Amino acid sequence: MGQVELVRAGINYLSDGGCFTLMTGILARDPIASATVAAFANGAIESFTLAAAIDLPRGIRINTVSPSVLVEATSYHPSFPGYHQVKAVDVADAYVKSIMGKQSGQIYKLD
């Protein structure tokens, strides 16, 4: 759970009112075959985001960006038949919203 450790260690270095933006994916809410551990990890990060938003000190915020499979990640398309594909630029916009906005504890889902 490297992202959790990043937050735990980073609290001491992030400015007051700063923001952590983590990343998960579609597997947290719509898993595929042979991806049980990945689905578990995605769900755990999303739950961590919700809980940490309550406890983070000094106005520090935390959000997670959670896209479906990317249009540009063509090697993954066969594993996600029927899934809506999202553009990388849309994922980037979600990061901007997280970092520049004021919300905390959000899961920005791009399906």
List each model region and its residues.
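C-terminal helical subdomain
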Residues: 57-60, 64-111
